[in-house]
Structure formats: structure tokens, C-alpha cells
């Protein structure tokens, strides 16, 4: 059976002076809690190796909900353990109503009106002022991020050398281009590729809400681009090369944390086949999976091919090409997160369950339908806590690979996952009020 997570490329023990290490955190709504579990395990293995202090990732690129995790790590790059502990605290205490309006009134105001417009748009077109911008209102998320992430610290981390660069990606509804906004202390020239550009910017919370604005689900966010306002949505849309920003920013080794399985084992697809006409929820889940998951797997395979090709070239020929090998470690879920979400659909607030039921999300457990869509919206501790546990266990199961990738000595785990979950809340302890 093929491994659902590709192995690291050219992995070998190395001295701590190896080139800059980048971190890629992809999108996926509530699925981003899995990233936190991976990071918690990496932090523990790092402590076991006798290291602490500043982040091992001076270059971080985040997309969608991964942008929130990326910005948190970057703004606390002087204390990697504290940043990760804070993220664990956030995600295992997060609730739906801290991300989007989940009360009955809020759903009536946005979701039901949006569904009515979709079904009776021809009849209500004259009431343009009432047209909603999205299925759900994510203004609670913006309020949470303004309190949670101290973006002013990013300049300090860059100036002190704890960070080299932070990149946040978004997709412009205005121009159709995929845009990577990046902030650095040292000058790095922006890059231009087909339908994707990079722009140096002073990153803000608004960049995070733009990058995490799941299409149809959350409203677009206006950002300034070359002095003109443009409307942006989720950075996973039209992101054909999610690993590219870290490479452009100078990373020579990259840890990629996915939000879905990179490859399905034989036989697993047939069990998940839709046997009748798909519901709106199943179609939406399929579309979101295409946006969030497919590009990363393709980009990893592309990088593998480039690395393999370069390894076949004579030394002189390798020196003559601008291409360079980039070592990458990919950690992605060993379980289908759709199935995991199906076990926890019942934990959603009644108003959200009612809204999702209207588009075909029904049942719980093995008999559930539409759970792919639910997996992006299930910001509840029962689900995010399981994702954190899964991220930890997947990473610890590949402990030897992780230790080799970072050049840490191979050794047994010094702390069990349960104890890792009980660590103090890091920088989150200094924040006012409950998360």
C-alpha cells in the first residue's frame, strides 16, 4: 500500500548551519488545526534534542486558515515553543461563534437570504441592496484576530533576525490574479509568473481575513494593491504553486504541512463513492477539496521531479542551470478528514446544522453525508482537538524522518502526546479574556 505522505527528498543528517528552512501552511478552514498538532510534535522533538528559543522556520508562507497559524508563528518567532503552545490553546478551545455568526438571527440575516437568492434570484433581483455577500458572516473572526495576533511584532522579529520573511497569499476577484503578499527586513525582489504575482507589503489582519475567505462561505476582503483597492478571497484559489513563495524567499529546505491526504490508498475511494445524484453539500465539498488540496499534491510531485532530474545531471551541468534542489518534508493527515468530521457533525450549533441540512449535510458517523463541506466549518473543540491529536501522532510516527530533516540526533520520545496537550498556553496566557 503506498504511503499517503510522500517521504522526504534527499534526507540526511546535517549540521545546524544548513540553509534556511521554510514552512508551508496550506488552507482548509477548521482543518488547519491539524497543522498545530504537527507543530506541537515538532516542538517536542526539538526540545528532546536540546534546542529551544527562536523558531527553526525563518521563512513561513501561509494560505487560508494556514495564514493565521503562519502569522502567529512569525509574530512570536523569538519563542517557538510559546508560539506553538499558544496555537494549541487557541485551537483546542475554539468555537464556531468565534469564527462566524452561528446564532439563528445571524443565519437568517446571511445564510437563509443567500440561499433564497440562489433559488429565487430571478424574482428578487430588484432588491439588490439585500443581496448578501456570503453564506456566513465571519466578522467574529476579524475581531478574534485583532485581539489574538500582534502584527506589530512582525517588524521586531524581522529586524532581530528571528524571521527572514512571512508570505500570505490571496486570490483577487478584481484582477483574477493570485497574489502573494510578503514582508521582509532585507530587500527581496518581487516575482512575476503567469496569473500569479508577489507584492511586498506591510502585512495586517486584513491580509489574513482575505486569505482565509473561503469562496461563497465567507465574504471577500478589500486590500490595497498598487494604490488601488481590490477584492480578495481565499488564497488557495488559483494557487497553482503553493511551495513557490518559500523558494522565492530563499528557503533551501521546506516543511510542508497539508490539510488533506496527499494520496488515497487503493480501495479507499470506492468506499467513499456517491451512489446517487450528489447533493449541493457534496458538490460544495468536492469543489473545496479541489481548491484546497489538489494543487499542493501536484506541486510536491513537480518538486520531486525537478530534484530527481537535477540529481541525474553531472556537477558541471547542475551548476549551469538556475534550478537548485530543494529538500522537502511533507506531513499530511493519515486519515480522511471528511470521515473524522462526520463523527462530529452533531457538535455544530443548531442554527448551523439547520442551514447545512438544507444543502444536504445529514447524519453523523458512517451514515453521514456532506461531511467534506462540514470539515471546513467545524470549528468546535471535539473536532479540532482530534485533528491536533492526529497531527501529533502522524508526526511522531515519522519521528526518525523529522529528526533527520532538521539534523537532530535520533532518540526516543521524551514526552507523551497527552502531556504535550497539557502544556501551558504560551503567549496566550497574556491575552485579555478567554479565547
Q: What are these language model-derived features?
A:
Residues 132, 145, 308-435:
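C-terminal helical/tail subdomains of lipid-metabolizing enzymes
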Residues 159-252, 256-287, 366-378:
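Active-site gating loop/helix substructures
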Residues 22-25, 57-64, 165-171, 328-332:
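Extended hydrophobic secondary-structure segments that form protein cores and membrane-embedded regions
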Residues 1-21, 112, 413, 423-435:
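N-terminal low-complexity/intrinsically disordered extensions
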Amino acid at each position: 500500500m503506498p504511503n499517503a505522505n510522500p517521504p522526504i527528498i534527499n534526507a540526511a543528517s546535517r549540521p545546524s548551519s544548513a540553509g534556511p528552512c521554510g514552512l508551508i501552511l496550506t488552507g482548509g478552514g477548521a482543518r488547519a488545526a491539524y497543522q498545530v498538532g504537527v507543530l506541537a510534535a515538532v516542538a517536542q522533538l526539538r526540545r528532546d534534542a536540546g534546542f529551544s528559543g527562536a523558531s527553526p522556520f525563518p521563512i513561513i508562507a501561509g494560505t487560508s486558515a494556514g495564514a493565521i497559524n503562519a502569522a502567529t508563528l512569525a509574530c512570536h518567532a523569538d519563542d517557538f515553543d510559546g508560539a506553538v503552545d499558544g496555537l494549541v490553546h487557541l485551537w483546542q478551545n475554539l468555537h464556531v461563534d468565534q469564527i462566524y455568526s452561528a446564532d439563528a438571527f445571524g443565519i437568517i440575516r446571511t445564510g437563509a437570504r443567500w440561499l433564497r437568492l440562489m433559488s429565487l434570484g430571478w424574482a428578487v433581483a430588484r432588491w439588490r441592496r439585500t443581496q448578501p455577500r456570503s453564506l456566513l458572516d465571519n466578522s467574529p473572526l476579524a475581531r478574534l484576530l485583532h485581539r489574538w495576533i500582534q502584527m506589530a511584532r512582525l517588524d521586531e522579529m524581522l529586524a532581530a533576525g528571528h524571521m527572514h520573511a512571512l508570505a500570505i497569499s490571496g486570490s483577487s476577484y478584481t484582477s483574477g490574479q493570485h497574489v502573494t503578499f510578503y514582508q521582509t527586513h532585507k530587500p527581496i525582489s518581487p516575482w512575476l509568473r503567469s496569473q500569479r504575482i508577489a507584492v511586498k507589503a506591510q502585512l495586517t489582519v486584513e491580509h489574513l481575513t482575505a486569505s482565509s475567505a473561503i469562496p461563497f462561505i465567507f465574504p471577500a476582503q478589500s486590500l490595497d494593491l498598487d494604490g488601488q483597492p481590490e477584492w480578495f478571497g481565499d488564497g488557495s484559489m488559483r494557487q497553482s504553486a503553493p511551495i513557490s513563495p518559500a523558494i522565492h524567499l530563499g528557503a533551501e529546505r521546506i516543511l510542508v504541512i497539508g490539510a488533506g491526504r496527499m494520496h488515497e490508498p487503493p480501495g479507499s475511494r470506492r468506499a467513499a463513492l456517491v451512489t446517487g445524484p450528489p447533493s449541493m453539500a457534496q458538490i460544495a465539498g468536492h469543489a473545496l477539496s479541489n481548491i484546497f488540496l489538489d494543487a499542493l499534491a501536484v506541486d510536491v510531485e513537480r518538486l520531486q521531479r525537478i530534484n530527481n532530474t537535477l540529481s541525474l545531471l553531472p556537477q558541471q551541468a547542475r551548476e549551469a542551470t538556475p534550478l537548485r534542489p530543494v529538500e522537502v518534508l511533507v506531513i499530511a493527515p493519515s486519515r480522511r478528514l471528511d470521515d473524522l468530521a462526520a463523527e462530529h457533525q452533531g457538535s455544530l450549533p443548531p442554527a448551523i446544522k439547520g442551514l447545512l441540512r438544507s444543502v444536504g449535510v445529514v447524519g453523523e458517523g458512517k451514515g453521514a453525508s456532506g461531511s467534506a463541506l462540514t470539515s471546513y466549518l467545524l470549528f468546535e473543540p471535539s473536532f479540532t482537538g482530534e485533528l491536533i491529536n492526529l497531527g501529533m501522532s502522524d508526526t511522531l510516527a515519522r519521528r526518525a524522518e523529522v529528526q533527520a530533516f532538521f539534523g537532530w540526533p535520533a532518540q526516543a520520545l521524551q514526552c507523551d502526546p497527552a502531556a504535550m496537550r497539557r502544556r501551558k498556553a504560551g503567549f496566550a496566557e497574556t491575552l485579555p479574556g478567554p479565547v
